[in-house]
């Protein structure tokens, strides 16, 4: 699949995957969360790889956003670059990387304006690594506004980061040049 565009506007759904399911590679995903309600959002696919995954939260009721995909074989489900933008919106938990296996190479999270993160903020994935021992990755969290009610972690939850983690906090942390 070349490019997959998904927009949530005015409905309630359990899960959104930006990419493919159980086969193929999606080159680009763009998930836009405008209104409605969703439990889990994945920029990547289900058990598949995505080259560039982007999730933008602009007003939907969202429980958890993952920049990468869900599941995959030990090294399957690779997300090369993920970007999450939370713009003047509310999310419970945010993970820059994959969930439950697979690998994210590079993950960037941008929190802007009056955004509210009511739970945890992880630069990496949940039970999914950032990079590999032989191929380093990177997480970057940029916070230029908003409130994070719990903790901020540059790395992953119950997984490793092979590479670097960066957390930038302040008015100039997210600029027009930050990945979107």
Residue ranges and their predicted role:
Residues 1-15, 21-40, 46-66, 70-93, ...:
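Surface-exposed loop/turn motifs in large extracellular/passenger domains
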